[in-house]
A protein has these predicted regions:
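Glycosyltransferase donor-sugar binding loop
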Residues: 40-42, 181, 213-230
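Short alpha-helical donor nucleotide-sugar binding micro-motif in glycosyltransferases
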Residues: 119, 251, 256-261
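Donor nucleotide-sugar binding/catalytic pocket of nucleotide-sugar-dependent glycosyltransferases
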Residues: 120-165, 180-182
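A charged, aromatic-enriched C-terminal amphipathic alpha-helix characteristic of glycosyltransferases
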Residues: 160, 303-306, 316-344
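Conserved donor-binding/catalytic core segment of Leloir-type glycosyltransferases
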Residues: 168-194, 200-203
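Nucleotide-activated donor-binding/catalytic signature segment of Leloir-type glycosyltransferases, i.e.
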Residues: 218-220, 228-249
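Aromatic "clamp/platform" in nucleotide-sugar-dependent glycosyltransferases that forms part
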Residues: 269
Protein backbone atom coordinates (compact mmCIF):
# COMPACT_ATOMS: atom_id res chain seq x y z
CA UNK A 1 0.00 0.00 0.00
CA UNK A 2 1.26 3.49 -0.87
CA UNK A 3 2.74 5.63 1.89
CA UNK A 4 1.45 9.19 2.09
CA UNK A 5 2.49 12.14 4.25
CA UNK A 6 0.14 15.09 4.74
CA UNK A 7 1.86 18.31 5.86
CA UNK A 8 -0.76 20.76 7.09
CA UNK A 9 -2.33 22.48 10.06
CA UNK A 10 -4.48 19.75 11.60
CA UNK A 11 -7.23 19.52 14.20
CA UNK A 12 -7.60 20.65 16.95
CA UNK A 13 -6.49 23.67 14.96
CA UNK A 14 -9.26 25.94 13.72
CA UNK A 15 -10.05 26.73 10.10
CA UNK A 16 -11.06 25.15 6.81
CA UNK A 17 -7.57 23.94 5.89
CA UNK A 18 -7.15 21.97 9.11
CA UNK A 19 -10.68 20.54 8.85
CA UNK A 20 -10.24 19.46 5.21
CA UNK A 21 -6.77 17.98 5.83
CA UNK A 22 -7.99 16.14 8.91
CA UNK A 23 -10.86 14.56 6.97
CA UNK A 24 -8.52 13.60 4.14
CA UNK A 25 -6.17 11.95 6.63
CA UNK A 26 -8.89 9.95 8.40
CA UNK A 27 -10.65 8.92 5.18
CA UNK A 28 -7.36 7.62 3.77
CA UNK A 29 -6.76 5.71 7.00
CA UNK A 30 -10.20 4.12 6.84
CA UNK A 31 -9.58 3.14 3.22
CA UNK A 32 -6.44 1.27 4.20
CA UNK A 33 -3.75 3.73 3.15
CA UNK A 34 -0.49 3.96 5.08
CA UNK A 35 -0.75 7.67 5.86
CA UNK A 36 0.99 9.97 8.33
CA UNK A 37 0.30 13.61 9.16
CA UNK A 38 2.78 16.30 10.18
CA UNK A 39 0.90 19.07 11.99
CA UNK A 40 2.69 22.36 11.28
CA UNK A 41 1.10 23.80 14.42
CA UNK A 42 1.33 22.70 18.05
CA UNK A 43 -1.61 21.07 19.80
CA UNK A 44 -0.86 23.34 22.76
CA UNK A 45 -1.97 26.72 21.44
CA UNK A 46 0.37 28.74 23.66
CA UNK A 47 3.32 27.40 21.65
CA UNK A 48 1.89 28.63 18.34
CA UNK A 49 4.13 31.68 18.19
CA UNK A 50 6.42 32.58 15.26
CA UNK A 51 9.77 31.41 16.73
CA UNK A 52 8.38 28.03 17.84
CA UNK A 53 6.44 27.50 14.62
CA UNK A 54 9.51 28.32 12.51
CA UNK A 55 11.58 25.79 14.46
CA UNK A 56 8.89 23.13 14.07
CA UNK A 57 8.67 23.79 10.34
CA UNK A 58 12.45 23.57 10.02
CA UNK A 59 12.32 19.94 11.22
CA UNK A 60 10.02 18.70 8.41
CA UNK A 61 12.79 17.46 6.03
CA UNK A 62 14.44 15.62 8.92
CA UNK A 63 11.11 14.01 9.82
CA UNK A 64 10.85 12.79 6.21
CA UNK A 65 14.49 11.73 6.01
CA UNK A 66 14.33 9.55 9.13
CA UNK A 67 11.03 7.84 8.32
CA UNK A 68 10.44 5.01 5.90
CA UNK A 69 10.15 6.32 2.35
CA UNK A 70 6.92 8.08 1.42
CA UNK A 71 5.43 7.73 -2.07
CA UNK A 72 3.52 11.02 -1.91
CA UNK A 73 4.09 14.15 0.18
CA UNK A 74 1.01 16.36 0.11
CA UNK A 75 1.50 19.92 1.44
CA UNK A 76 -1.27 22.25 2.59
CA UNK A 77 0.99 25.07 3.76
CA UNK A 78 0.38 28.84 3.59
CA UNK A 79 2.79 31.55 2.60
CA UNK A 80 5.79 31.98 0.34
CA UNK A 81 8.71 30.87 2.50
CA UNK A 82 7.03 27.66 3.67
CA UNK A 83 6.40 26.52 0.10
CA UNK A 84 9.92 27.50 -0.95
CA UNK A 85 11.52 25.61 1.95
CA UNK A 86 9.57 22.42 1.21
CA UNK A 87 10.56 22.61 -2.47
CA UNK A 88 14.25 23.30 -1.82
CA UNK A 89 14.43 20.20 0.38
CA UNK A 90 12.91 17.89 -2.25
CA UNK A 91 16.25 16.04 -2.86
CA UNK A 92 15.98 14.43 0.61
CA UNK A 93 12.45 13.08 -0.05
CA UNK A 94 13.80 9.84 -1.57
CA UNK A 95 11.88 10.20 -4.82
CA UNK A 96 8.48 10.96 -3.28
CA UNK A 97 5.98 12.78 -5.47
CA UNK A 98 5.36 16.33 -4.17
CA UNK A 99 1.85 17.80 -4.21
CA UNK A 100 0.92 21.35 -3.19
CA UNK A 101 -2.65 22.43 -2.48
CA UNK A 102 -3.21 26.18 -2.82
CA UNK A 103 -5.98 27.19 -0.43
CA UNK A 104 -7.56 30.53 -1.20
CA UNK A 105 -7.20 32.75 -4.24
CA UNK A 106 -4.14 31.56 -6.18
CA UNK A 107 -3.67 34.70 -8.29
CA UNK A 108 -1.81 36.97 -5.81
CA UNK A 109 0.35 34.06 -4.70
CA UNK A 110 1.63 33.00 -8.10
CA UNK A 111 2.69 36.56 -8.93
CA UNK A 112 5.59 35.96 -6.54
CA UNK A 113 8.73 34.65 -8.30
CA UNK A 114 9.69 32.50 -5.30
CA UNK A 115 6.28 30.82 -5.29
CA UNK A 116 6.60 30.11 -9.01
CA UNK A 117 9.99 28.51 -8.35
CA UNK A 118 8.57 26.41 -5.51
CA UNK A 119 5.59 25.24 -7.56
CA UNK A 120 7.81 24.25 -10.48
CA UNK A 121 9.38 21.68 -8.14
CA UNK A 122 5.98 20.12 -7.43
CA UNK A 123 4.70 17.10 -9.33
CA UNK A 124 1.10 18.29 -9.01
CA UNK A 125 -0.63 21.51 -7.92
CA UNK A 126 -4.19 21.46 -6.59
CA UNK A 127 -6.19 24.72 -6.76
CA UNK A 128 -9.29 24.78 -4.54
CA UNK A 129 -10.82 27.72 -6.43
CA UNK A 130 -12.39 26.40 -9.63
CA UNK A 131 -10.78 28.03 -12.66
CA UNK A 132 -7.47 28.91 -11.01
CA UNK A 133 -5.55 26.02 -12.59
CA UNK A 134 -6.15 27.40 -16.09
CA UNK A 135 -4.76 30.78 -15.02
CA UNK A 136 -1.45 29.45 -13.70
CA UNK A 137 1.56 31.09 -15.36
CA UNK A 138 3.57 29.29 -18.03
CA UNK A 139 3.99 25.55 -17.82
CA UNK A 140 2.45 25.41 -14.33
CA UNK A 141 -0.92 24.97 -16.04
CA UNK A 142 0.23 21.47 -17.07
CA UNK A 143 0.74 20.52 -13.43
CA UNK A 144 -2.33 22.22 -12.00
CA UNK A 145 -5.82 20.83 -11.44
CA UNK A 146 -8.95 22.25 -9.78
CA UNK A 147 -10.14 20.20 -6.79
CA UNK A 148 -12.21 22.11 -4.19
CA UNK A 149 -11.36 21.40 -0.56
CA UNK A 150 -14.78 20.04 0.39
CA UNK A 151 -14.58 16.61 2.01
CA UNK A 152 -17.53 15.42 4.07
CA UNK A 153 -16.87 13.76 7.42
CA UNK A 154 -17.86 10.09 7.52
CA UNK A 155 -20.00 10.79 10.61
CA UNK A 156 -21.75 14.10 11.40
CA UNK A 157 -22.63 14.48 15.07
CA UNK A 158 -22.21 16.86 18.01
CA UNK A 159 -19.77 14.71 19.98
CA UNK A 160 -17.07 17.39 20.04
CA UNK A 161 -19.32 20.46 20.21
CA UNK A 162 -19.00 22.33 23.55
CA UNK A 163 -22.29 22.09 25.49
CA UNK A 164 -22.67 25.86 25.89
CA UNK A 165 -22.53 26.31 22.11
CA UNK A 166 -24.93 23.45 21.46
CA UNK A 167 -27.39 24.86 24.02
CA UNK A 168 -27.28 28.29 22.37
CA UNK A 169 -27.97 26.78 18.94
CA UNK A 170 -30.72 24.41 20.06
CA UNK A 171 -32.70 26.71 22.38
CA UNK A 172 -34.14 28.98 19.75
CA UNK A 173 -37.30 30.22 21.46
CA UNK A 174 -38.64 30.90 17.98
CA UNK A 175 -35.79 33.21 16.97
CA UNK A 176 -33.72 32.87 13.82
CA UNK A 177 -30.10 31.72 14.17
CA UNK A 178 -27.23 33.24 12.18
CA UNK A 179 -23.74 31.74 12.24
CA UNK A 180 -20.56 33.67 11.44
CA UNK A 181 -16.95 32.59 11.79
CA UNK A 182 -13.67 34.23 10.90
CA UNK A 183 -10.19 35.27 11.94
CA UNK A 184 -9.15 38.74 13.13
CA UNK A 185 -7.06 39.68 10.09
CA UNK A 186 -6.15 43.36 9.84
CA UNK A 187 -3.08 44.44 7.88
CA UNK A 188 -1.86 46.78 5.15
CA UNK A 189 -3.79 44.81 2.54
CA UNK A 190 -7.03 44.05 4.37
CA UNK A 191 -9.08 46.00 6.89
CA UNK A 192 -11.08 43.32 8.71
CA UNK A 193 -10.64 40.59 6.09
CA UNK A 194 -13.41 38.32 7.44
CA UNK A 195 -15.97 41.09 7.97
CA UNK A 196 -16.55 41.15 11.74
CA UNK A 197 -17.64 44.80 11.64
CA UNK A 198 -19.95 44.20 8.68
CA UNK A 199 -21.55 41.26 10.49
CA UNK A 200 -22.16 43.19 13.72
CA UNK A 201 -23.57 46.21 11.87
CA UNK A 202 -25.95 43.98 9.90
CA UNK A 203 -27.04 42.12 13.03
CA UNK A 204 -27.75 45.36 14.89
CA UNK A 205 -29.95 46.43 11.98
CA UNK A 206 -31.75 43.08 11.92
CA UNK A 207 -32.44 43.19 15.67
CA UNK A 208 -34.64 46.24 15.13
CA UNK A 209 -36.75 44.29 12.65
CA UNK A 210 -37.14 40.82 14.13
CA UNK A 211 -36.03 38.14 16.58
CA UNK A 212 -32.52 36.96 15.72
CA UNK A 213 -29.60 35.24 17.43
CA UNK A 214 -25.98 35.30 16.31
CA UNK A 215 -23.29 32.72 16.99
CA UNK A 216 -20.05 34.60 16.30
CA UNK A 217 -16.89 32.47 16.20
CA UNK A 218 -13.35 33.86 16.32
CA UNK A 219 -10.85 31.50 14.69
CA UNK A 220 -7.40 31.63 16.25
CA UNK A 221 -5.61 34.37 18.12
CA UNK A 222 -5.14 37.86 16.57
CA UNK A 223 -1.63 38.06 15.12
CA UNK A 224 -1.06 41.79 15.59
CA UNK A 225 -2.18 44.80 17.62
CA UNK A 226 -4.69 45.84 14.94
CA UNK A 227 -6.35 42.43 15.13
CA UNK A 228 -6.53 42.65 18.92
CA UNK A 229 -8.07 46.11 18.68
CA UNK A 230 -10.64 44.84 16.18
CA UNK A 231 -11.80 42.09 18.54
CA UNK A 232 -11.84 44.51 21.47
CA UNK A 233 -14.07 46.81 19.43
CA UNK A 234 -16.39 43.98 18.38
CA UNK A 235 -16.74 42.45 21.85
CA UNK A 236 -17.46 45.92 23.23
CA UNK A 237 -20.35 46.33 20.79
CA UNK A 238 -21.95 42.98 21.65
CA UNK A 239 -21.05 42.81 25.36
CA UNK A 240 -24.58 43.38 26.67
CA UNK A 241 -26.45 41.65 23.88
CA UNK A 242 -27.80 38.31 25.12
CA UNK A 243 -28.78 37.41 21.56
CA UNK A 244 -25.11 37.07 20.61
CA UNK A 245 -22.77 34.31 21.71
CA UNK A 246 -19.11 35.08 21.04
CA UNK A 247 -16.85 32.02 20.91
CA UNK A 248 -13.10 32.55 20.97
CA UNK A 249 -10.55 30.00 19.78
CA UNK A 250 -12.48 26.82 20.61
CA UNK A 251 -11.62 23.78 18.44
CA UNK A 252 -14.82 22.26 17.07
CA UNK A 253 -16.38 21.66 13.66
CA UNK A 254 -19.06 23.90 12.21
CA UNK A 255 -20.69 21.23 10.08
CA UNK A 256 -23.04 19.77 12.75
CA UNK A 257 -24.19 23.27 13.78
CA UNK A 258 -25.51 24.10 10.32
CA UNK A 259 -28.43 21.77 11.07
CA UNK A 260 -29.67 24.37 13.58
CA UNK A 261 -28.82 27.57 11.66
CA UNK A 262 -31.19 29.53 9.46
CA UNK A 263 -28.40 31.38 7.65
CA UNK A 264 -24.63 31.09 7.51
CA UNK A 265 -23.05 34.50 6.84
CA UNK A 266 -19.57 34.80 5.29
CA UNK A 267 -18.78 38.49 4.56
CA UNK A 268 -15.15 37.96 3.51
CA UNK A 269 -13.19 40.49 1.42
CA UNK A 270 -11.44 37.65 -0.45
CA UNK A 271 -11.89 33.88 -0.39
CA UNK A 272 -10.99 30.50 -1.75
CA UNK A 273 -13.52 27.79 -2.44
CA UNK A 274 -14.75 28.02 1.19
CA UNK A 275 -15.22 24.63 2.79
CA UNK A 276 -17.73 26.08 5.26
CA UNK A 277 -20.04 27.36 2.50
CA UNK A 278 -20.20 23.93 0.90
CA UNK A 279 -20.78 22.35 4.32
CA UNK A 280 -23.68 24.70 5.02
CA UNK A 281 -25.28 23.97 1.65
CA UNK A 282 -24.84 20.24 2.19
CA UNK A 283 -26.71 20.61 5.51
CA UNK A 284 -29.54 22.58 3.78
CA UNK A 285 -28.55 25.83 5.51
CA UNK A 286 -28.97 29.06 3.53
CA UNK A 287 -25.76 31.00 2.84
CA UNK A 288 -25.21 34.75 2.44
CA UNK A 289 -21.78 35.81 1.22
CA UNK A 290 -19.84 38.33 -0.84
CA UNK A 291 -19.65 38.09 -4.61
CA UNK A 292 -15.86 38.56 -4.79
CA UNK A 293 -15.16 35.04 -6.14
CA UNK A 294 -17.13 32.35 -7.95
CA UNK A 295 -19.58 30.88 -5.44
CA UNK A 296 -21.33 27.49 -5.46
CA UNK A 297 -24.85 27.35 -6.83
CA UNK A 298 -27.54 28.13 -4.28
CA UNK A 299 -25.94 30.95 -2.24
CA UNK A 300 -27.26 34.50 -1.76
CA UNK A 301 -24.61 37.09 -2.66
CA UNK A 302 -24.27 40.84 -2.07
CA UNK A 303 -21.93 43.56 -3.36
CA UNK A 304 -21.48 46.06 -0.52
CA UNK A 305 -21.76 45.92 3.31
CA UNK A 306 -24.79 48.22 3.22
CA UNK A 307 -26.71 45.44 1.45
CA UNK A 308 -25.86 42.67 3.93
CA UNK A 309 -28.80 43.00 6.35
CA UNK A 310 -31.28 43.20 3.47
CA UNK A 311 -29.86 40.14 1.74
CA UNK A 312 -30.01 38.17 5.02
CA UNK A 313 -33.67 39.15 5.38
CA UNK A 314 -34.31 38.17 1.77
CA UNK A 315 -32.65 34.80 2.37
CA UNK A 316 -34.82 34.25 5.46
CA UNK A 317 -38.00 34.97 3.53
CA UNK A 318 -37.05 32.99 0.43
CA UNK A 319 -37.85 29.39 -0.19
CA UNK A 320 -34.86 27.15 0.41
CA UNK A 321 -32.84 26.92 -2.81
CA UNK A 322 -33.25 23.77 -4.83
CA UNK A 323 -31.13 21.11 -3.22
CA UNK A 324 -27.66 21.30 -4.72
CA UNK A 325 -25.62 18.19 -4.09
CA UNK A 326 -22.16 19.09 -2.80
CA UNK A 327 -19.59 16.83 -4.39
CA UNK A 328 -17.28 15.13 -1.91
CA UNK A 329 -13.88 15.72 -3.53
CA UNK A 330 -12.07 13.06 -1.53
CA UNK A 331 -12.41 10.59 -4.41
CA UNK A 332 -10.82 13.11 -6.78
CA UNK A 333 -7.73 13.34 -4.57
CA UNK A 334 -7.45 9.55 -4.43
CA UNK A 335 -7.59 9.42 -8.23
CA UNK A 336 -4.86 12.07 -8.44
CA UNK A 337 -2.66 9.99 -6.12
CA UNK A 338 -3.24 6.90 -8.27
CA UNK A 339 -2.26 8.72 -11.47
CA UNK A 340 0.87 10.15 -9.86
CA UNK A 341 2.01 6.74 -8.68
CA UNK A 342 1.24 5.07 -12.00
CA UNK A 343 3.62 7.55 -13.66
CA UNK A 344 6.37 6.97 -11.09
Amino acid sequence: MSRILIISPMLPGIGGVSVSSNRLFHNLKKDGYDVDAFNIRFKNGKHNKPPYLALRYFTIPFYILFHRRYDIIHCHVPGVLRKLYISLCKPVYKGAKLVFTIHGDAHPLVDNKFVKYALRKADKIICVQVGDSAKMPGKLTEKAVDIPAFILPRVIDNTFTPKSILDFCENDGGSKLLIFNGAAVVNDEWDDLYGFKDMVAAFKALETRGDYRLLMILNGVPKNRQGEELIKEITGQIANDRSVKFVENEPFELCPLFRFADVYVRPTKTDGDSLSIREALAMNCKVVTTNIVNRPQGVFVYESPSQLAGVIENAMESEPPASVEQIDYYQYIKELYTKLLSNA
